[in-house]
Amino acid sequence: MRLAHALLPLLLQACWVATQDIQGSKAIAFQDCPVDLFFVLDTSESVALRLKPYGALVDKVKSFTKRFIDNLRDRYYRCDRNLVWNAGALHYSDEVEIIRGLTRMPSGRDELKASVDAVKYFGKGTYTDCAIKKGLEELLIGGSHLKENKYLIVVTDGHPLEGYKEPCGGLEDAVNEAKHLGIKVFSVAITPDHLEPRLSIIATDHTYRRNFTAADWGHSRDAEEVISQTIDTIVDMIKNNVEQVCCSFECQAARGPPGPRGDPGYEGERGKPGLPGEKGEAGDPGRPGDLGPVGYQGMKGEKGSRGEKGSRGPKGYKGEKGKRGIDGVDGMKGETGYPGLPGCKGSPGFDGIQGPPGPKGDAGAFGMKGEKGEAGADGEAGRPGNSGSPGDEGDPGEPGPPGEKGEAGDEGNAGPDGAPGERGGPGERGPRGTPGVRGPRGDPGEAGPQGDQGREGPVGIPGDSGEAGPIGPKGYRGDEGPPGPEGLRGAPGPVGPPGDPGLMGERGEDGPPGNGTEGFPGFPGYPGNRGPPGLNGTKGYPGLKGDEGEVGDPGEDNNDISPRGVKGAKGYRGPEGPQGPPGHVGPPGPDECEILDIIMKMCSCCECTCGPIDILFVLDSSESIGLQNFEIAKDFIIKVIDRLSKDELVKFEPGQSHAGVVQYSHNQMQEHVDMRSPNVRNAQDFKEAVKKLQWMAGGTFTGEALQYTRDRLLPPTQNNRIALVITDGRSDTQRDTTPLSVLCGADIQVVSVGIKDVFGFVAGSDQLNVISCQGLSQGRPGISLVKENYAELLDDGFLKNITAQICIDKKCPDYTCPITFSSPADITILLDSSASVGSHNFETTKVFAKRLAERFLSAGRADPSQDVRVAVVQYSGQGQQQPGRAALQFLQNYTVLASSVDSMDFINDATDVNDALSYVTRFYREASSGATKKRVLLFSDGNSQGATAEAIEKAVQEAQRAGIEIFVVVVGPQVNEPHIRVLVTGKTAEYDVAFGERHLFRVPNYQALLRGVLYQTVSRKVALG
């Protein structure tokens, strides 16, 4: 019992001590007021690649974060509360990576700083909205239970401002979610060239922005002070805000034992909406609701994205005819152009449609009277004509002499007697009918009046002599001739053919019935009385022009001013004159080399063609380019394609030229548009596809993009290939190990265009030079261009320079009149060095000879093993040829030959062409083989001392027998023409004009030797032979 009383005080003391320990521990826990701070660090392309070496600006951001972590120190408030820190961090680009979750400070300070220091930048796009929402998630799942003590520090440059859809709902949505949760967001800039509007959106309000800066380019004291001030200001703001939360009461003693349960309190205020829960399963469909009231008209929505191309609309109606435009001012008369070249003879055309008959021609001259034609075949007898009315009785004429007894007519059959008819009245005279079929012989009628003689018809064109026809029947009796003198009564002739039927006379009275046979016809009666004059005939044809009369005396002046008479009718065409004598032989027409020279002067610039080509555009689509600059770059590509199509006539179609575009960002972020794609049918489809390219806004892996271009868009081809690489020259070479010279090769030319980015940085020339293959051993060197801004891409001058560079290897026709030798050839140029030439003119011929020699020695050969050799010799009098025979040789080295020509001195003596030809003939027989073509080009005016045409003919024929073909150059008008013809043809008797045109060259003066393309003409004809 005593033991129990002794132990009881000890037990009570132990219980009291335990109670004090528990209360003490609770008091300590209550004194901590935790604050959660989470860093959101931007390591996108616009930050990582802004400074060299790449990642330097990210290192500054990491340095800022570590300095900030070092400043997170606990603080004791007067309310007996301690501020303690929980800190964490993430970094982001187009993906988000947690550096370290919320960690208790200061115990986890070193681990957090080490994790920040080990960050490797992403260097791609910028998804700030996703990063903020990930930071909110980290703050909510750990740390303090007080939402008022949770803070987010977003360190970014704010890029990009626009141009692509942020995948996590957008920046404003993320910031509004933070405000809704009561989490404050500080916005800290990476300066300069940050986007203040975006940073202002990120900050909870303007007090959380305050021009805070986390990194600056400069290393000055001011920059360090600004960063230190940023850290101190943010920490002080958090401490002040937290004090109001942690010290919401003055003092609080240790807690006592729990009291009795209190009464239920009043209903509290409505709490803040909770976080959105997970998406539930779809419920059963509800029944249709009642029709609601008509809603108010909503506000105008934001502008939608560009719609797809609509279907082709219906064909429009034909428009009204436009008004006639105002006539333009007449232009000035242009300069006289070069004469056009004769075109090739066209193929015969199809027979045209027969044209309408032409107008009646002028009457031809009267032809000579043709010979009497042979008798034609008997015509069919015409139908009997109507009887004309008898004319008025004429005056009795003088009795004519008795006519010759007519031939007895055929005996006719006796006709039946007709009944006497009544006498009819005289009818109108009808037109003469065609002769009818001969009828039976009628009763003898009364003699009709004699008709007027008709007018003579025009003489017809004599016809071709026809074949002899069959003997025709006996013709009718001819017209009655004029009465001749009375002749002797002749014996009765044979019975003649019946005469033409006369006009039907009036019916006579019935006679007594006959009773005998019909007698022979009586003699013709006397001519009747002369009838009245006939109607006037039509106007006859004009007669032949008479001989020119003598000039008459001048008439008296007529002072009356009469009106001018009507212009007379066009006269008849005179007879064709005799053929004139043949004209002189005209000068030779332009040679082929002269024609090519004319063509080159007229249209060589417009005939050079650009293409076919393969042009590739490699377009930087990284974040540092910016949306507006990316759109300008696409317009530049379209304008280049248009200029090549219109100005350079490049045809972008299958089998011709090809174009392609590659846009790129970071690794595996490439997209291309290719004219070889099945959905791109023409250049218009290609341009539409380029317009639809969307800005990627990521990192910059230029080497990988160039490798992609070579693998996908550079198949083997014979076309000229050129690649235009448009970039800011800041490829992430630390992570992109593909060399920038991947396109360098002998089959492609690379042009790099470097442009300042959105931060105003000048493009890196070192990368641009490597891209364009400059200073490299492999590949053809390209061109590197640097521009201040993307707007300069659309400058007209720059576009013109780019298209000129693309088409620098134009395919132009060859107007140089090239020459080719089909066999080995030895050519000697024989220069006249006599006194008649003169020293100045001799120097001119030496220059001309060197031009010819250069053309000969550089000419093409059908077989490279066949040699062309040239020798130049000057001559004057007898025995005066230089170089001498010992030094003379054929040369193939132009430099040596030109030096020997330059060393020639003017001889200035007599002229002996025969001796010069004999010298060259001996030289060829000794130094030239038999299979080699031997040609001599001789300068001469045909004058030779003491030489005759026969002597020259002998010398030329001797050279021809040695196989030498002679060409002659004649300078000036003072020439011996007969001797020149003998030098050309080797004949004194005749001259072949065609042969002379090929072997004779006439020049007006020595200066003309060096003008134009005469040296090409001469060398070509000598080469062809």
From Swiss-Prot:
Keywords: Cell adhesion, Collagen, Extracellular matrix, Glycoprotein, Hydroxylation, Repeat, Secreted, Signal. Its main location: secreted. One of its GO terms (molecular function) is platelet-derived growth factor binding. Residues 256-591 are annotated as: Triple-helical region. Residues 20-255 are annotated as: N-terminal globular domain. Residues 1-19 form the signal peptide. InterPro entries: Collagen, Collagen-VI/PIF, VWF_A, vWFA_dom_sf. Pfam families: Collagen, VWA. Residues 592-1025 are annotated as: C-terminal globular domain. A motif (Cell attachment site) lies at residues 261-263, 441-443, 477-479. This is Collagen alpha-1(VI) chain. It comes from Mus musculus.
